[in-house]
A protein has these predicted regions:
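Active-site nucleophile/metal-coordination loop of metallo-enzymes that catalyze phosphate/sulfate
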Residues: 2-9, 16-189, 198, 202
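Short, contiguous, pocket-lining structural segments
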Residues: 195
Length: 203
């Protein structure tokens, strides 16, 4: 007898979660007869959607990017942030051929080094610790002119918090004795991913 299976749909309810608390819990308080019927009639379970379970650093809230990636892969996919964190801890980061080539070129030709990227601890698309590691590399190579261009994170950090992150970068530069903040721009312009040249041009 042929085992006939119907179509299978993976339906993702972004922002949907489980909590035993009812006060302020829109999911628990809402009237969802179809959803309730699914839970009553079919097997179900809870899954973790944050931290190491989705390839993020421990204690870091999940997001749709990593959640969808892990569901699609059927396994935990370590994020780029975690991979770089791992390489910094093991020292592999400091052996990176491309980074070392850039530093060597700056030293050889007495050129300035420009470090640019998202200045944020949102841990979705960046970590400030990565920029700090680059500054340490520049310090060890004896680079004197190092300029940091901060891309502000208006998505994964609290509103009006930019001054805190820029101050942290300045403090780290002062602590290491290398680098200075040369420019500040929002990610809306500097990290546009929709190929809107008018934004990138302004950055």
């Amino acid at each position: 007898m042929t085992d006939k299976r119907g179509p299978l749909a993976l339906i993702i309810l972004d922002g949907f979660g489980h909590s035993d608390a009812r006060e302020g819990n829109a999911v628990a308080l809402a009237s969802m007869p179809f959803y309730d019927e699914l839970r009553e009639k079919y097997p179900h379970t809870l899954i973790e959607a944050s931290g190491g379970c989705v390839g993020l650093p421990a204690g870091v809230m999940g997001n749709s990017n990593v959640g969808h990636l892990c569901m699609g892969a059927g396994r935990v996919v370590r994020t780029d942030i975690e991979r770089i964190n791992h390489d910094i801890k093991t020292g592999e980061f400091f052996q990176n051929l491309a980074l070392n080539a850039a530093l060597e070129s700056a030293v050889k030709h007495d050129r300035a080094l420009h470090v640019m990227g998202l200045t944020s601890d949102g841990l979705v698309h960046s970590s400030q610790e990565h920029a700090y590691a680059l500054l340490r590399m520049a310090k060890e190579r004896g680079l004197r002119r190092v300029y940091v261009h901060c891309f502000l994170d208006g998505r994964d950090t609290p509103p009006a918090s930019a001054d805190r992150y820029v101050a942290a970068m300045r403090d780290k530069c002062s602590q290491l004795g290398v680098g200075e903040v040369a420019s500040v721009v929002g990610r809306y312009y500097a990290m546009d991913r929709d190929k809107r040249w008018e934004r990138t041009e302004r950055a």
